[in-house]
Amino acid sequence: MAIDIHNDEKIALFIDGANLYAAARPLCFVIDYKKLLGIFRKRGRFIRGLYYTALVEDQEYSPIRPLVDWLDYNGFTMVTKPTKEFTDSFGRRKVKGDMDIELAIDMMEMAPHLDHIILFSGDGDFRRLVEVVQRKGVKVSVVSTVKSSPPMAADELRRQADQVLAHARRVVAE
């Protein structure tokens, strides 16, 4: 099954980078972002592909930096922010970098200019966002996976979406 996109639809991709990575890793596949962008540029009227990720700023080398730079130079709009470091109640060092608010704000802001949004995330926290965007007349498709354990695509998000591609390998894998 593929996502149904009409030729006249204005479309945008919203990629929750951490969630997509977490879905792909246990399934042992690498995401071909060039192919992914190419697929959607050929369908509908492609407006933008946004990729959301937090970056560890204080490290000499960040393992995600080469990907971020490649995406930035190859057609994606990068939305990043620095991670925050804190110590939990057990004295363990933790790093936090949630991009959900940034993604939600951008989606709400762009929704009036789009016909179809493709959300690459299985995060159930986005269910209400999807509902509100749909009320604005925008179709929302979700790409994630139910093949992982536990499934990365939350049930409530799958139920809310207009279309679900729960076997993300068909769209994003090499």
Annotate each PLM feature:
Residues 1-99, 124, 139, 145-149:
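Domain-level signal for Mg2+-assisted phosphodiester chemistry and nucleotide/NA-binding surfaces
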Residues 104-108, 151-174:
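Structural recognition of alpha->loop->beta junctions
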Residues 101-117:
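Conserved interaction-surface patches within small, structured recognition/assembly domains
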Residues 112-155, 159:
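Active-site histidine-anchored catalytic micro-motif
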Residues 96-98, 102, 121, 158:
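Residue-level recognition of hydrophobic positions within alpha-helical transmembrane segments
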Residues 53, 121, 168:
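Residues that line or immediately flank small-molecule/substrate-binding pockets and catalytic motifs
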